[in-house]
């Protein structure tokens, strides 16, 4: 059992994976859960919502590459700075990460 104020073990592991994703690459919420062998996309999303602010949160996205609602502008700035592959949008700025090109499967990939 965690001490009050201590980050739960699962949350700590999610944030460690998030921070290990190389610049320009992403994992989906489900990818993170699968990599850890624990939880699922919703559990990873909850961790990111509660404790992800100090991590590289923009590197964890929806499985379809869509940007985190409410954080699109900040995420796009990070993606452009890191050279993350984006899918063009006919209606203006890119609206998704190109998962085929940007997905990271874990260490050494």
Predicted features and spans:
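Nucleic acid-binding interface residues in structured DNA/RNA-binding domains
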Residues: 1-109
């Amino acid at each position: 059992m965690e001490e009050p104020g201590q980050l739960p073990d699962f949350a700590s592991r999610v944030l460690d994976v998030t921070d290990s994703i190389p610049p320009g690459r992403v994992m989906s919420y489900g990818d993170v859960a699968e990599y850890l062998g624990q939880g699922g996309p919703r559990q990873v999303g909850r961790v990111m919502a509660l404790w992800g602010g100090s991590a590289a949160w923009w590197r964890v996205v929806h499985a379809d590459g869509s940007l985190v609602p409410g954080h699109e502008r900040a995420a796009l700035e990070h993606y452009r700075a890191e050279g993350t592959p984006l899918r063009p949008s006919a209606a203006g700025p890119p609206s998704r990460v190109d998962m085929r090109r940007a997905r990271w499967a874990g260490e050494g990939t």
